[in-house]
Curated annotation (Swiss-Prot):
InterPro entries: Aldolase_TIM, ThiamineP_synth_sf, ThiamineP_synth_TenI, TMP_synthase
Cofactor: binding comment: Binds 1 Mg(2+) ion per subunit.
Cofactor dependency: Mg(2+)
Binding site for 4-amino-2-methyl-5-(diphosphooxymethyl)pyrimidine: 37-41, 69, 108, 138
Protein name: Thiamine-phosphate synthase
One Gene Ontology MF term: magnesium ion binding
Keywords: Magnesium, Metal-binding, Thiamine biosynthesis, Transferase
Length: 207
């Protein structure tokens, strides 16, 4: 299993159609996704379980780490590779204590460097900054300054991820400033060619 926290970090949309979700996800995985996060804020427990198990099996076949958003019980229950938590979830320290030292743990830090430093100290594997641009999926204010990426590159030790309305073009300067990962949802899942869309993001990290 690859565990390189670098490149395209694909996040799932709130789709109840599991077959469609798997089909589009596999196309994206073929395009070079580095990590996949399962995030479905409106699904019931049964649908979350079903989709998570199917997506995890798909990720295993492509040797891509599989991350669960928020639901620690689900993460542990299926032995996912990691979990991502935000400001309304348990603290990073609490989650790290629950999941142990080996799983990937991501933390949403919005536009707050102090929060990122605290998350790093508490055991986060990576920190996520954003939103940078208006998002079709996640409704949050666009308040994060692009300079936070270079500031974190100079100060932080764990990788950073940028989120919020990401396209291949608007994320390019953030990657140039030091972002280790770009999180995308609609730019890949709603693309006419999801595999090509994923590949376009991946090209930002080619050196």
């Amino acid at each position: 299993m690859k565990s390189n926290l670098h490149g395209l970090y694909l996040v799932t949309p709130d789709w109840d159609d599991t077959r469609k979700l798997l089909e589009i996800t596999e196309l994206a995985l073929k395009g070079g996704v580095s990590l996949l996060q399962y995030r479905h804020k409106t699904a019931d427990a049964a649908l979350r379980q079903e989709q998570a198990e199917c997506l995890q099996a798909l990720c295993r076949s492509y040797e891509v780490p599989f991350i669960i958003n928020d639901h620690i019980d689900l993460c542990l229950g299926i032995n996912a590779d990691g979990i991502h938590v935000g400001g309304t979830d348990k603290s990073v320290a609490e989650v790290r204590a629950i999941i142990g030292p080996d799983k990937i743990l991501g933390s949403s830090c919005y536009g707050d460097l102090a929060l990122a430093h605290a998350a790093e100290a508490a055991g986060a594997s990576y920190v996520a900054f954003g939103g940078f641009y208006p998002s079709k999926v996640k409704k949050y204010p666009v308040t994060t300054a692009p300079t936070i990426v270079s500031d974190w590159k100079a100060q932080g030790k764990v990788p950073s991820c940028v989120i919020g309305g990401m396209t291949r073009d608007n994320s390019a300067p953030l990657v140039a400033n030091g972002a280790d990962m770009v999180a995308a949802i609609s730019s890949v899942y709603l693309a006419g060619d999801p595999q090509a869309a994923a590949r376009a993001f991946v090209s930002l990290f080619a050196k």
